[in-house]
Amino acid sequence: MTYTLLNKIDDPADLRKLDRRQLDTLAEELRAYVLESVSQTGGHLSSNLGTVELTIALHYVFDTPNDRVVWDVGHQSYPHKILTGRRDRMSTLRQYGGISGFPRRAESEYDTFGTAHSSTSISAALGMALGARTRGEKRVGIAVIGDGAMTAGMAFEAMNNAGVYKDLPMLVVLNDNDMSISPPVGMLNKHLARLMSGQFYAATKKGIEKVLSVAPPVLEFAKRLEEHAKGMVVPATLFEEFGFDYVGPIDGHDLESLVPTLQNIRQRALEGHGPQFLHVVTKKGQGYKLAEADPILYHGPGKFNPAEGIRPSAKPSRKTYTQVFGEWLCDMAAADKRLIGVTPAMREGSGMVEFEKRFPDRYYDVGIAEQHAVTFAGGLACEGLKPVVAIYSTFLQRGYDQLIHDVALQNLPVVFALDRAGLVGADGATHAGVYDIPFLRCIPNMMVMVPADENECRQLLTTAFQQDCPTAVRYPRGAGVGVATQPELTALPVGKGEIRREGHARAGQRVAIMAFGSMVHPALTAAEQLDATVANMRFVKPLDVELVKQLAANHDFLVTVEEGATMGGAGSAVLEALAEAGIELPTLVLGLPDKFIDHGDPAHLLSLCGLDAAGIERSVRERFSLTAQPVKVASVA
């Protein structure tokens, strides 16, 4: 496809030079460009195809970047990036040194607020609007948020706050596409997906009349309903009660409707009519039939041929850790009826699809509500059940107070299965699970386990399930190391590691590497060159202190290695144990540096951080001034 109009647009100022009648053609070109780009790089597709017209309309009507647009979650911001001067860099999307898959302030002045976790946009836009007013500047703060993100309490906390400011130039755009990553849940989403029909309107009005005698304030709602015939009965009332002027729902793919509606809203906002709320209905995957038919499959695809669509790949030779968890969950549920599965809107990503099919009465998707998920699981545990919360490591951060106050303080037996621990690659710093070890191991009653391979992951999940205290099992994204999983539900001894390799270096060069989780196998490879001992520690908490002492007694140097933050991490736990035992021995702590790691290929990122086998070997030699071992070359007859 030729991009006649799109090639003329280097920023929104160029966009605003177009005649309104040209916008539909631009939308066709922009949608085609998004599809072409993502098919070549991989990335988020369905959500971006669904926001093309909305993105065009926002930049056409509002004075960006003076008016601040905040994209909630941000994975739907590719059209925005293309229209704001980054069209020619889309080929670098989510690659090391390339542009991010999410809005990023350091990347463009049009990325007014960095996002990636959900439900933050309204708070940020409110802060921007009030900040501008404090500085005597006139601009509109705009939050674009999906219906899935509206299930999080933070969004409503922000709206409750925003409604207080009756003259604040602020706009919330609800992008109602009836789908977060997994189909959204909860009563709010049921209402958002239910466009008013004549029968629904009549039934609602009749119901209101019945309660007028006990709820006089509802009379005003009935009048508004009849006068304006609003398309969304419950949301209109709900959002207006928060202090917003509600408009909608309107077709989010109809520029003839979007542009004038937004123009009117902008004028009202700048004239001091207070916070505005626009409800648009869009379709994920819009314009690409394969994505329309299966938006979940096309949510975040790798490279593919748009003409053919995503083809089933050959069955991988190695299971992913997510698959290992999903299989274990079903097996344990079959063995123990107390098991309950809980996820905050990550059914597919966390490997719970089969569990939901087999055990629908024991599966709870609580929506994008991590705080609620943690406390909800605590409530289940109070009733003698054994909840397993499947959650990405990075998202557990959002429920930290609940983890401490509602679960650990009461010593409730909740299992936290932490997927995506460590670096995650293309999604970058916002999704990296690198802080879980420090923030978990400092909590009393909490156990923290770190499997080295697929079968050990299954065993440690079983170990966690058998405990009468809160537990966490962290495992990385992607395929394992190729170890077959055994069908038995076998637990491992609590707080005990193992020696995976005995070193035989000469005195003065004896190195012991204590490896945690995903770092065991790189450590084993490095140890071959160092002739070092390698311990698979398995537990961060309780730490195998006896093993630490044993290694210290028989070696000249100690090394810890983990795929996580070193400040307060597993290495810190080892140093604390050594100090408490009064042991002084040169110790090298390896892990991720004290900075945010950008997006890129995971193997490349680990190499840059010195956490591949070569990096581990190099760091050990440099720190302890070890000489290279002579390489034995087999004679050739």
From Swiss-Prot:
One of its GO terms (molecular function) is magnesium ion binding. It catalyses: D-glyceraldehyde 3-phosphate + pyruvate + H(+) = 1-deoxy-D-xylulose 5-phosphate + CO2. Pathway: Metabolic intermediate biosynthesis; 1-deoxy-D-xylulose 5-phosphate biosynthesis; 1-deoxy-D-xylulose 5-phosphate from D-glyceraldehyde 3-phosphate and pyruvate: step 1/1. It comes from the Bacteria. Mg(2+) binds at D147, N177. Disulfide bonds: none annotated. GO terms for biological process: 1-deoxy-D-xylulose 5-phosphate biosynthetic process; isopentenyl diphosphate biosynthetic process, methylerythritol 4-phosphate pathway; terpenoid biosynthetic process; thiamine biosynthetic process. Its EC number is 2.2.1.7. One of its GO terms (cellular component) is cytosol. Thiamine diphosphate binds at H75, A116, H117, S118, G148, A149, N177, Y288, E370. SUPFAM superfamilies: Thiamin diphosphate-binding fold (THDP-binding) (SSF52518), TK C-terminal domain-like (SSF52922). CDD domains: TPP_DXS, TPP_PYR_DXS_TK_like. Its cofactor is Mg(2+); thiamine diphosphate. It holds the Pfam family Transket_pyr. Binds 1 Mg(2+) ion per subunit. Binds 1 thiamine pyrophosphate per subunit. Keywords: Isoprene biosynthesis, Magnesium, Metal-binding, Thiamine biosynthesis, Thiamine pyrophosphate, Transferase. The keyword Ribonucleoprotein does not apply. NCBIfam families: dxs, PRK05444.2-2. Catalyzes the acyloin condensation reaction between C atoms 2 and 3 of pyruvate and glyceraldehyde 3-phosphate to yield 1-deoxy-D-xylulose-5-phosphate (DXP). Homodimer. PANTHER family: 1-D-DEOXYXYLULOSE 5-PHOSPHATE SYNTHASE-RELATED, 1-DEOXY-D-XYLULOSE-5-PHOSPHATE SYNTHASE, CHLOROPLASTIC. Belongs to the transketolase family. DXPS subfamily. This is 1-deoxy-D-xylulose-5-phosphate synthase. It comes from Cupriavidus metallidurans (strain ATCC 43123 / DSM 2839 / NBRC 102507 / CH34). The lineage of its organism: Bacteria, Pseudomonadati, Pseudomonadota, Betaproteobacteria, Burkholderiales.
